[in-house]
């Protein structure tokens, strides 16, 4: 135990490179068992606390009075410079303003509204899988890249002819979750340019909706501007947030799903034989893969936790993936079991900031699994996965696989 504690002193949890190897799960298991509230001193970025147990992650995320969301909401260089979304974006607000922002777009994310997308999303998934089966050997990251863009684009009101552009720009703009893009000046410049182009695209789309409104999210953002509830810049930040939230986690979650089934082939056969397990399988995928690694909160007052003092103004990282591997809550937490019945995972968050797109995310995964079972008989890795070096996303640069038809 002393050697593990000594090793922890030399690990910077804000360094994305630490997460490029799945061995990080062992470090978080140690923290859950021996140091559930851990102080990460200033290094890559300012110092911060980490909570790793399920009970603590749930408590901190639910208590928006003690632990606020108005600062930077993820680890990254913006903690030095400040975050443009602070106090303005849905993820960076609390209380009445958060409720008001959420209400503006809630109608588009109800289960009833999402259900209308099912036939369309199923066709996108089936076409992507059929094309991959024709190639046989593919990078599965590319195979599933269109699914999240297609779904959020439909809700936003983006024409199908622009999907390719949206995929290209979102991949470039939000690829900065990768350590290589954070350290390369040219890559950072490309990401900034793509991000600017996305915001200009949003501005053009809002201009169109002012004269030709539709039943979509962009129209609702324009209506909120007209009512004085949002500035144009705030509306563009909202558009930005929905694209990011609907793209990275869903895409990498689908890739992580296939990887989990390749690691546990008996679970794949179990699901193919019994589709009644689809719902619990989706829950287990979300728990086991945990596409979103963490969120940040800021202490609004001095508070004590596990006998240690968190000072007002200090940041606290809520590590969702660690909570989802907590043996105090989950039996055999490191095992992938699609029949798991007790599964109160935190992959979609909890409390006031519970994922706005939860119904969409779960439907996407359920359709993806169903079509995967329909079309793919077996999958095998051609080479080990190349993981993203990211503190934010449990994702992949590449997963080269061979797919065989059902």
Regions found by a protein language model. Give the residues of each.
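Cytochrome P450
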Residues: 1-406
